[in-house]
Amino acid sequence: MNTYAFNRELRLLTPEHYQNVFQQAHRAGSPHFTIIARNNNLSHPRLGLAVPKKQIKTAVGRNRFKRLARESFRNTQHQLPNKDFVVIAKKSAQDLSNEELFKLFDKLWHRLSRPSRG
């Protein structure tokens, strides 16, 4: 049975983890956020978040975006390939509803999961 937890092993934790993703990465983007992915040598995908204060001004907005990104990742982690993902928020992300964000996340997760994406 699959577990849908989002524990420590599913997160990018150190600056080195993030730097590895930014080198030779594949991107899937929208006007609201970008997801960058790179293959890892682990048996599971990992997620990192970058939500700049310059893009989403309020802490409530940043926390909402991060919460929805984690939840979307948590629900789709078993369909995702073994890659490290970094989600980078853009200013217009705060204008979307929760439902619109989830749909957009699903679309971009699917795009990055295709075999032709490295």
UniProtKB/Swiss-Prot annotation:
Gene3D superfamilies: 3.30.230.10. GO terms for cellular component: ribonuclease P complex. One of its GO terms (molecular function) is ribonuclease P activity. Pfam families: Ribonuclease_P. It catalyses: Endonucleolytic cleavage of RNA, removing 5'-extranucleotides from tRNA precursor. This is Ribonuclease P protein component. Belongs to the RnpA family. It comes from the Bacteria. It is an enzyme of class 3 (hydrolase). The keyword RNA-binding applies. The lineage of its organism: Bacteria, Pseudomonadati, Pseudomonadota, Gammaproteobacteria, Vibrionales. Consists of a catalytic RNA component (M1 or rnpB) and a protein subunit. Keywords: Endonuclease, Hydrolase, Nuclease, RNA-binding, tRNA processing. Its EC number is 3.1.26.5. GO terms for biological process: tRNA 5'-leader removal. RNaseP catalyzes the removal of the 5'-leader sequence from pre-tRNA to produce the mature 5'-terminus. It can also cleave other RNA substrates such as 4.5S RNA. The protein component plays an auxiliary but essential role in vivo by binding to the 5'-leader sequence and broadening the substrate specificity of the ribozyme. The keyword Nuclease applies. PROSITE patterns: RIBONUCLEASE_P (PS00648).
